[in-house]
Structure formats: structure tokens, C-alpha cells
Amino acid sequence: MPLQTIHKLKHQYTHNKSSSHQKKHTMINPKRLVHLAKKWQHMAALGRRRLTITGATKEGNLRCSSAIADKGHCIIYTADGERFGVPLTYLSTTVFGELLRLSEDEFGFTGEEKITLPCEAAVMEYVMCLLRRKPSEEVEQAVVSSVVMPCNYKSSTSMVSVNLSQSLAIF
């Protein structure tokens, strides 16, 4: 907030005419006024940041509904049939490398079929969200061992959800 605006606010606050039956306003310390202005700016910035995070739709963790992939993306399905538009840069990560290897083992790759990963949509959303943050190699390895590997076992769906909630608490 510019210094002139602070002085105007201070001037308006201290020079308000109050009637005789009302309490007289005390003057706000300029340091306190500056502190309040910074606090309001910080709160406004948090509000803007919150809107951009929840409104972000281009970078990944959303399910894809269009028939054709966006530029720089490919369409990948999960075992429960959900469809995701995945940025091509994610395909070179350790996590996706392991998911694609498991997919090839379980479903096989032919040039004519869709790519299906052996995990549920919730796991895929978590992986996409994590990769958007550009994690370290150690974090990717931890995700592979705690979240991705249990996806390979179809009978252990409860283990996948337990590992997912534990991983969300850790990261």
C-alpha cells in the first residue's frame, strides 16, 4: 500500500467529526496502520493464490473429457476406466516409467489399444499432483515403492488406499 494512501487513511480516521454523545476516536499509530496494511495485502495475496491453485486445469491432475489430447499431452486410462491427459514430460519420470512397465506386464502394448495403467484414478491424481511439484528422485522412488507397486496387485485395493493416505500424510 503506498505511503500516500496510508496518510490519507490516517487523516480520514483522525479527522472524523464525532458528535458530543459519541466516543472520540483515538489516533492509530502509523506503525500499526502500516502493519494492518501489510496484513491485508498478505491475506489478499493468499486469496489470489488459493484461486489459482484450485482453478488450475492445464497442468495435469484433472481427468480428461475431450476426445483428442491437448498439445504436449497424451491420453492415459486407469484400471477403473478414468481418462487423464498427461503432459509428455511426465512420461520420462521414474514413477511413470514404473507405471508403464507394470501396464505392459499386465495389459500388453499394441499400437491400436488405449494405454491403461494398473492403478485407480485416486492414485493417478496423487501421482499427477506430486509430479506437478517437481519432486526429487528420492521422493519419486518413495512413491514407486509405497503407492505404485501395490497397484500391481488387483486383490490388494485396500492396501493401495491405505498406502495412499499414508503417503499423503508424509508428503
Curated annotation (Swiss-Prot):
Pfam families in the record: Auxin_inducible
Distribution of this protein across tissues and organs: Highly expressed in mature leaves and at lower levels in young leaves, flag leaves and internodes.
GO cellular component, one term: cytoplasm
InterPro entries associated with the record: SAUR_fam (IPR003676)
Triggers of expression: By auxin.
GO biological process per UniProt: auxin-activated signaling pathway; negative regulation of organ growth; regulation of auxin polar transport
KW Cytoplasm (keyword) present: yes
Annotated localization: Cytoplasm
Domain of life where this protein originates: Eukaryota
Keywords: Auxin signaling pathway, Cytoplasm, Developmental protein, Growth regulation
Function, as annotated: Involved in the negative regulation of organ growth. May act as a negative regulator of auxin synthesis and transport.
Note in the entry: Plants over-expressing SAUR39 display reduced shoot and root growth, altered shoot morphology, reduced size of vascular tissue, low yield and decreased basipetal auxin transport.
Protein name (record): Auxin-responsive protein SAUR36
Species the sequence originates in: Oryza sativa subsp. japonica
Gene of this entry: SAUR39
